């Protein structure tokens, strides 16, 4: 069994050694331009077209939760990957726990009005503020995949009213489910906090725009943990300036790194982190990949395969 590996920033040698330990029968090598030797599996992140084109692979593993970089290249270069080759993504591998930590900490930050107290502190102003009531602090989650379900579970512990919106209806206990474009307005109407965990697909690009933000209650909050392309940044800035949106916590952006001239950096109601809400944990990823390869070799059904038509 031959495995090729490519990631522009990961410690390649660590991955090769870890994969050797997890799959002793495999020959693992770092892919470099010009390497046209045969391979059974490819582990990749933002791979060059030539790495995958023309290969008779058993499967490709994206080394992250998203596969949009691969699918976008496939649109321009359909020869990059045969339709018959299954494409897998890392559905969790520790990312769910990280998303839970990030989302819960920020929701509580807003719920306890720490953002308002920070602004008061900046002007040396001492003034206790009225508390928010949990029953009026509905949290809405855009996207109900693996990570969305993890975030919902963690927030249920804090007894906030919860709702989700997705392509198809969910039957999660203690959570109100909305599905399809026809139910999006009703979903948004009660969301004091909107958490975005949608996949990046042609249908979701630019979905958080002026029209969507106007349907939120006045003074709502936005937490974007998915992709920067989901948000029309100028529309968000306008909503923040008008007070329609009271605060935004943004981990992802249309351009990364976020350019120094972006007005988001200096906006008093915006908090920025550099795409760190959930990162790939190498040991857990190797465990998932090795188990999945073993299942594929046995002809068993496996989880995590991407539906290329849907984009996730």
Swiss-Prot record:
It catalyses: glycolate + NADP(+) = glyoxylate + NADPH + H(+); (R)-glycerate + NAD(+) = 3-hydroxypyruvate + NADH + H(+); (R)-glycerate + NADP(+) = 3-hydroxypyruvate + NADPH + H(+). Keywords: Cytoplasm, NAD, NADP, Oxidoreductase. Its EC number is 1.1.1.79, 1.1.1.81. One of its GO terms (cellular component) is cytosol. Coiled coil: none annotated. PROSITE patterns: D_2_HYDROXYACID_DH_3 (PS00671). This is Glyoxylate/hydroxypyruvate reductase A. It comes from Escherichia coli O81 (strain ED1a). The gene is ghrA.
């Amino acid at each position: 069994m031959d495995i090729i590996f490519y990631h522009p920033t990961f410690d390649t040698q660590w991955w090769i050694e870890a994969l050797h330990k997890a799959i002793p029968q495999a020959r693992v090598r770092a892919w470099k331009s010009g390497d046209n030797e045969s391979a059974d599996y490819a582990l990749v992140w933002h791979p060059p077209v030539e790495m995958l084109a023309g290969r008779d692979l058993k499967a490709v593993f994206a080394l992250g939760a998203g596969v949009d970089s691969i699918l976008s290249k496939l649109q321009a270069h359909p020869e990059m990957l045969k339709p018959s080759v299954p494409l897998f993504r890392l559905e969790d591998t520790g990312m769910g726990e990280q998303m839970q930590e990030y989302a819960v900490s920020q929701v509580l930050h807003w719920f306890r009005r720490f953002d308002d107290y920070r602004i008061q502190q900046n002007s040396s102003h001492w003034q206790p503020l009225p508390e928010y009531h949990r029953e009026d602090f509905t949290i809405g989650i855009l996207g109900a995949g693996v990570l969305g379900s993890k975030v919902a579970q963690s927030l249920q512990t804090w007894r906030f009213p919860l709702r989700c919106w997705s392509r198809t209806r969910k039957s999660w206990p203690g959570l109100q489910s909305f599905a399809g474009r026809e139910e999006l307005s009703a979903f948004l109407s009660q969301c004091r906090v909107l958490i975005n965990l949608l996949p990046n697909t042609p249908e979701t690009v630019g979905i958080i725009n002026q029209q969507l933000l106007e349907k939120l209650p006045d003074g709502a909050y936005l937490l974007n943990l998915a992709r920067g392309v989901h948000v029309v940044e100028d529309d968000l800035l306008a909503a923040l300036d008008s007070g329609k949106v009271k605060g935004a916590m943004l981990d992802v952006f249309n351009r990364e790194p976020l350019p120094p001239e972006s007005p988001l950096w200096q906006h008093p109601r915006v908090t920025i982190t550099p795409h760190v809400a959930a990162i790939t944990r190498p040991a857990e990823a190797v465990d998932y990949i090795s188990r999945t390869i073993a299942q594929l070799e046995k002809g068993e059904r496996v989880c995590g395969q991407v539906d290329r038509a849907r984009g996730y």
